[in-house]
Amino acid sequence: MDELKNLEFEPEITEKFEEGFNFRTVLAALFIGFIMLPGSIYLGLITGGGLGGAAQWVTVILLVEIAKRSFVQLKKQEIYIVYILASSLVSAGLIIGTGFLVLQGGAFSDLIWKQYLVQSPYAESFGLTPHIPRWAVPPPNSEAILKRTFFHKDWLIPIILVIVHNVLYRINMFSFGYALFRITSDYEKLPFPMAPVASEGATSLAEVSAKKETWRWRVFSISAMIGIIFGAFYVVIPTITGLLMTNPLQLFPIPWVDFTTQIENILPSGLFGFATDLGAILTGFVLPFWVVVGTFISSFLCQTIGNPILHKIGIIKNWQPGMTAIPANVVNTMDFWINVTIASGIVVGLIGLFKTITSFKRKFERIERKIPEGRGDYPIPIALLIWFLSTVVYIIICHILVPKFPILLFAFFGFFLTPFLSYTSARMFGITGVASGVAFPYVREATFILSGYKGAEIWFAPIPYFNHGYLAQSFKQLELTRTKFTSWYKAEFTALGIMLFCSFLFWSIIWRMAPIPSSTYPFAQKMWPMSAIFNALWATSTLEGGAKWMIEAIKLKSILYSTIVIYLIYGFILITKIPVAFFYGLVGGIVTLPHYAFPMFIGALLGRFYMAKKIGPNWQKYRPIILAGYACGFGLIGMVSVAVALIAKTIFQIIY
């Protein structure tokens, strides 16, 4: 059956497009940069969560409340621009290591990560340290590293590269993302089923701005109080005691309680524990039930039960008694699970690509619909030309930084993989609302290794390999809120300037207060080493005579067998008509630690079998607001503790 047969293009609403960027949104951006960003950085280092959606909610709520008391009614265009500004400023960050950790805090989070990597014992033990290029980070014996400061000449080139990359990336993403939107929305007329979610949220907040109190605010307020109370124990106590003690007091172990060493006599190499953040349970409320069930089953069977079996038959060889969750997960991954991860990525990616290709069988009306007046459009060829030129600049920069790497491979990333991946992703957003199954697993790493290049510089270069598919849905949301596209351009580049300055300022202050990671930042101290190990393993795989652990860990036979098994599971799920979401949960659970899968599963069970019956049909509406309210309250109390810590440590440094 054609999956698209019921997807018909609906005529757009006829409201006039309006400007969403003005002085009020600039003030909101400044508030986010100077108030929310440092809180996000500090909380990310302590708990690993950052502010996330809380930054968006807090900023919008504050703006709405100020406007109400000033007898000003905010337009939905202004509210939506502020909403995406908060996401851009606070959530922007770096995916480090294996991709499981996101380091929030703007552009300079990249340099903070690299200063840790260059002086980490893992980079040194693998022989990577002398090969890390100076244009990426100063050497570990530099005063810039020893004194923990960005105000040093050794940081000049890395900082310039960070700024150039952030400007160039936005030019690249806006131009190609706009072209994707025009193709998928105006020509192919895809429905983008998830786009109305954000647009309706902005509309609801605009109604609140008009002093219309709704049930949303009651639910949100109660949830926020829960977040404040829990955050007082989870964040405030460790933060405040960290000012007075070498090791902060933690009423709840951050980020989890780990039972790995306790169960090793029964389940050697098995992992088990549970995350102590209440947000993990609330996340189980919101995520699709079958996704959570699949994630928990897969995580428990693979990481808790499967590892001991693999250890007993000699596949997992490097596990040693006494290993906690992090080192045990590293050796288990290297011995076996990295091959299953690659296989699962291949399967999910091919499924997404197959759905995209088969969707072409639908006979779209290839006549472009009339472009709404005042939307902020410009010709597609101009957009593609801007994207082409920005990609060329990326290739030139990469060739200058890594002249020995084949320039044709830079072009392969920029002019083939990026467009293909982005277009496939954009179509998946247009058809299903999500594109989590569209990816080319480890193609970047495989290209580096198989290219014959010898050196480590390529692993630190700004390769023009991006997925801009989500931009098509973002432009669709702008259209639904009747916001001029130019509002987003102006807001994003204004936010970029604020983000660069605030990221530089607050990372400088926080890094100066204590080494990152250290006992002051418990989440970073526990989780960053795992990512550093994987980074070092990948980077040394292309060194002349360097470490070959990563290459040796990847076994084509294991990948092939795993791919076949995963495809058989997918086929069984289709035949038995089990929800396909269960399959994607199974795939995601392979690499999910039980520490997170277990509390999410508890949350999913509570939500489906208790809360849904207790509250009734409205539970479906309450779920996302409960999580957002909790995140807001948690973020607010976290920001208060962060403010106290920053002031106290700054005064302490001034005195002494």
PLM regions with names:
Residues 1-656:
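Alpha-helical multipass membrane-protein architecture
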